[in-house]
């Protein structure tokens, strides 16, 4: 190079805003802190450029996503960046459209000038193999999830770890006990009896903890909701007046201070004290009923508030709890409405097989917790643990036959000796459970009444009625009689009319209105069967002709009455309280009930020579499903702590089905059954393993086949948050004359690409005979002729169709760059809602000078939109001041009332009680200069973790939050590490707040090409 040329080059470089000669390092980072993604999300990719010797030049970045059969290439024009303190730094926020990328392993490479970086990523489908929920609750975290998912043990919903391994395992997630302390199951918050769920100081604190936990994994694409807490119940505490026989204060669920406060707020008068209410008078009983029916709203109110918060995390987020175990604990707040406000009814059995009806207890609790909530999904975990394969089958299948929408297993493990049984049950539930996905519970011919008024009539005494229901339920199992549990509201509002008979047992009092309604039912076409121990006169009722007393009352009680030694008494109880003894005790009751029902021409769905075969009966349109579960008693279980449970054993049984002209299909095998016919019906000789299940499907007409319509592919790249490329398919179940069988039948749907590779292998079901399904395809899927094969899983018939797919060659919507400040997509609607709802806000700024200038700009920006803002320095905002009353039960993410150290006044840390923020707040700064943002970062509630390179020099970040800074505190966040970045963040916040959207959600790349292998 001659001297003149050299001088000209040096002069030219000096004139440029940044130094092109400086060495530039380029690094790929993933703001979601993972390299495993799903096909239903925007994949965030940040490109960090840096130079230790000057600024950064503008130029073209090439981003390449290379997989096994395709390569996608994008180019972006990146700006230069001037040096600060001699160093150059820039972070550019790019995104890939996961909706348009097929599952697989890819290498992502970024190149600009002579600098490059690459990273391997994995993308998995968000479409689950089965639409039935197969649930793992209390699961481990991280790599310990390996082998638990769809291709392993078979779970597709996970309550436990929320890490990226859940995506690899193809499971949706909810977390576990987000409101619980370290996942502990508690009736009251952190087991503090002072903290009742009727108390807003308590439940708002619980919601704060639940939101902090839920927000920590909200960017996971497989997060479908937040599991909040297990076994919440209204508290019992020392009563100020009630005393035990020895004169000591008694523990009671009545007259809890927060409940009395709420009652007075509602009725403008003091709630009567429990010890002053005389239930022997009509007026006293009416007052007692009014107090306790009002009390039944507390848990429901708590869940309303919880759901309202959780659903703000992301669209469709489910608020979940465990609300079924205490179905008859009226004074603990449990009735049909206790979780009415939640989108899913979820819970577990009452300590499984260790109480009540022993082997039958898990399904008993399930069926009696279902009344009046059958229009929504039910996810149920029958027991807490297991010890044999037979026990696990029995609990799971007895619950499955009720027609619930999700079946949860206890602490399963790939290393468990029962892993094969777990997998077997999950496979059955995945294949066949699709017929139950749409809640459509069958109203059984026989109903069993659970009486609320009988419990209220006993005040604080023990009602016999609930215990008697144990024996009635077991009797119906022994007589192959499926039942529907009903409550008094079902009797009063006419719901009972959907049944042919109702059994009333063990009651000593019924509300007169209920008696009248039962009499009307009996006067019509209904049958009211009353056991002889019922002391209520119901006109028109049919006397059973025998008592239905609880086994504990009729047998165990008298046997131990003369034993004075407590340990000896307990030992005798354990000796007598076994499932074997209960079955023998209940058999006469089952026989008599069966005789009475037969007299009324109410027959079971099948007959059998082995009475320990339980029956399930579900009707879905023109298809009847008859389910049989073997609970024949085998040997005594191990370990011995599960007292009274008897291990299920094998059975050879003859089952006779009605000869009603319908064909019979083995739904577990997928073929028609040829049964022998005799005068009693169609006979099947079957071998059952312990706890085993058989399922017979009986459509109105023989199945002829499956007709598959030609699939239609639709491409619409303008779609946001949904698949831009969709394949619509429909399959119809028909009889041998090609008429639609209008029912719900299980299907297997397999979609293959032109090379024969399986793209989808799914279990779904028809609805009214038709299964309509929309599946996403990707821009880089293989072009050519695709096939769809549909198999009906009842008869094994198949149908097939094909369609043509042409992959995209150019689609800039596959990638894009953030327009201005970074924000998480699901926060957008919440930010807009904040601006529409709030009229007064506080702006809490960090210590850096640029925050104050940005805040003043924000005050000016907000004023025309009727929002008045006040600026405060975040570090000067004190902790919330608590009164004595508040401090006693104040709860939060790290607090549970005075017993946890919460004190009156301002002595508490803001991390415990929140800040004194009378208005919603907009927080400006960084975690390093703003104490509020520091707490948010510590609790991991921000969608992205801010640091020196994120959002990066000159960039800002905007986020939304609820509850972290205090009870019900709504917050918006602007984070930036310099003035330019904060200016950008405030501007973006303004745009989001007033609804000023760019024409396209992302800035498109300069070019985009897609190469797909032939």
Where are these regions (language model features)?
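Carbohydrate-binding surfaces of carbohydrate-active enzymes
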Residues: 32-41, 47-48, 57-58, 102-110, ...
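Edge beta-strands of extracellular beta-sandwich domains
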Residues: 116-123, 707, 711, 761-763, ...
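Short, surface-exposed loop/turn segments at beta-strand-coil junctions that are enriched for proline
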Residues: 96-102, 776-782
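The substrate-binding groove and active-site-proximal loops of carbohydrate-active enzymes
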Residues: 132-141, 187-207, 283-300, 325, ...
């Amino acid at each position: 190079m001659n001297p003149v040329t050299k001088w000209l080059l040096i002069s030219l470089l000096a004139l440029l805003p940044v130094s092109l000669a400086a060495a530039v390092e380029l690094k790929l980072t993933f703001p979601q802190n993972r390299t495993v993604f799903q096909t239903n999300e925007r994949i965030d990719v940040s490109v960090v450029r840096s130079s230790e010797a000057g600024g950064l030049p503008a130029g073209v970045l090439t981003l390449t996503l290379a997989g096994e059969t395709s390569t996608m290439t994008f180019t972006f024009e990146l700006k230069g960046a001037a040096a600060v303190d001699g160093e150059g730094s820039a972070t550019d926020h790019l995104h890939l459209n996961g909706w348009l990328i097929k599952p697989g392993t890819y290498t992502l490479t970024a190149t600009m000038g002579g600098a490059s970086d690459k990273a391997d990523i994995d993308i998995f489908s968000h479409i689950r193999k089965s639409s039935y929920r197969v649930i793992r609750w209390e699961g481990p975290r991280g790599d310990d999830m390996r082998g638990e998912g769809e291709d392993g043990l078979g779970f597709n919903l996970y309550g436990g770890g929320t890490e990226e391994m859940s995506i690899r395992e193809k499971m949706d997630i909810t977390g576990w006990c987000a409101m619980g302390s370290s996942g502990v199951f508690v009736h009251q918050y952190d087991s503090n009896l002072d903290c009742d769920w009727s108390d807003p100081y308590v439940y708002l604190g619980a919601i704060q903890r639940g939101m902090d936990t839920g927000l920590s994994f909200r960017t996971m694409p497989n997060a479908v909701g937040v599991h909040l807490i297990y076994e919440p119940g209204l508290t019992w505490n020392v009563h100020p007046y009630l005393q035990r026989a020895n004169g000591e204060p008694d523990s009671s669920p009545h007259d809890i201070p927060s409940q009395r406060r709420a009652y007075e707020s509602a009725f403008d008068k003091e709630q009567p004290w429990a010890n002053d209410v005389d239930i022997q008078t009509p007026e006293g009983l009416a007052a007692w009923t009014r107090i306790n029916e009002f009390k039944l709203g507390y848990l429901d109110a708590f869940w309303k508030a919880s759901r309202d918060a959780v659903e703000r995390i992301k669209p469709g987020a489910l608020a979940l709890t465990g609300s079924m175990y205490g179905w008859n604990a009226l004074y603990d707040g449990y009735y049909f409405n206790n979780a009415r406000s939640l989108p899913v009814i979820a819970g577990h059995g009452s300590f499984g097989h260790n109480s009540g009806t022993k082997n039958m207890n898990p399904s008993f609790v399930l069926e009696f917790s279902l009344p009046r909530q059958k229009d929504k999904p039910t996810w149920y975990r029958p027991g807490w643990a297991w010890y044999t394969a037979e026990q696990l089958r029995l609990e799971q299948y007895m619950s499955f036959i009720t027609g619930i929408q999700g079946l949860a297993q206890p602490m399963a493990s790939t290393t468990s000796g029962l892993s094969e049984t777990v997998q077997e049950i999950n496979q059955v539930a995945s294949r066949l459970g699709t017929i139950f996905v749409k809640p459509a519970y069958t109203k059984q011919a026989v109903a069993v009444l659970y009486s609320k008024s009988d419990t209220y009539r006993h005040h604080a005494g023990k009602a016999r009625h609930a215990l008697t229901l144990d024996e009635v339920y077991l009797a119906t199992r022994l007589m192959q009689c499926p039942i529907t549990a009903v409550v008094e509201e079902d009797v009063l509002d006419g719901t009972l009319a959907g049944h042919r008979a109702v059994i009333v047992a063990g009651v000593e009092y019924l509300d007169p209105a209920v008696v009248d309604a039962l009499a009307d039912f009996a006067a019509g076409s209904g049958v009211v069967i009353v056991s002889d121990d019922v002391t209520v006169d119901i006109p028109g009722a049919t006397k059973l002709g025998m008592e239905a007393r609880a086994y504990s009352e009729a047998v165990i009680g008298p046997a131990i009455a003369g034993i004075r030694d407590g340990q000896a008494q307990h030992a005798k109880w354990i000796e007598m309280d076994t499932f074997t003894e209960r079955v023998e005790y209940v058999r006469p009751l089952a026989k008599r009930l069966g005789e009475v029902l037969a007299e009324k021409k109410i027959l079971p769905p099948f007959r059998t020579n082995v009475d320990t075969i339980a029956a399930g009966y579900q009707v879905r349109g023109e298809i009847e499903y008859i389910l049989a579960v073997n609970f024949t008693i085998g040997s005594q279980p191990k370990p011995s702590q599960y007292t009274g449970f008897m291990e299920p054993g094998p059975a050879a049984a003859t089952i006779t089905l009605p000869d009603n002209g319908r064909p019979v299909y083995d739904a577990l095998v997928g073929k028609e059954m040829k049964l022998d016919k005799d005068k009693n019906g169609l006979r099947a000789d079957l071998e059952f393993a312990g706890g085993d299940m058989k399922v017979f499907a009986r459509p109105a007409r023989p199945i002829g086949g499956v007709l598959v319509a030609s699939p239609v592919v639709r491409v619409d790249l303008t779609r946001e948050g949904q698949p831009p490329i969709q394949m619509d398919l429909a399959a119809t179940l028909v009889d041998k004359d090609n008429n639609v069988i209008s029912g719900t039948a299980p299907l297997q749907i397999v979609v293959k690409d032109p090379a024969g590779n399986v793209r989808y292998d799914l279990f779904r079901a028809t609805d009214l005979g038709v299964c309509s399904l929309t599946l996403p395809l990707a821009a880089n899927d293989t072009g050519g002729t695709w096939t769809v094969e549909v198999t009906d899983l009842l008869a094994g018939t198949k149908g097939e169709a094909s369609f043509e797919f042409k992959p995209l060659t150019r689609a800039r919507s596959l990638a894009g760059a953030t327009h201005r400040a970074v924000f998480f997509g699901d926060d957008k609607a919440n930010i807009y809602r904040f601006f529409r709802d709030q009229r007064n806000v506080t702006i809490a700024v960090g210590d850096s000078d640029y925050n104050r200038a940005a805040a003043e700009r924000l005050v000016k920006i907000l004023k025309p939109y009727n929002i008045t803002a006040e600026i405060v320095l975040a570090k000067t905002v004190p902790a919330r001041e608590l009164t004595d009353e508040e401090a006693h039960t104040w709860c939060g993410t790290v607090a549970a009332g005075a017993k946890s150290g919460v004190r009156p006044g301002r002595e508490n840390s803001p991390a415990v009680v929140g800040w004194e923020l009378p208005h919603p707040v907009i927080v400006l700064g960084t975690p390093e200069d703003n104490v509020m943002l520091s707490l948010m970062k510590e609790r991991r509630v921000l969608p992205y973790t801010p640091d020196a390179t994120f959002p990066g020099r000159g960039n800002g970040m905007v986020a939304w939050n609820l509850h972290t800074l205090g009870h019900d505190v709504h917050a918006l966040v602007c984070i930036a590490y310099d003035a330019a970045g904060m200016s950008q963040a405030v501007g973006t916040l303004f745009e989001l707040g007033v609804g000023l959207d760019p024409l396209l959600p992302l800035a498109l790349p300069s070019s985009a090409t897609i190469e797909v292998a032939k």
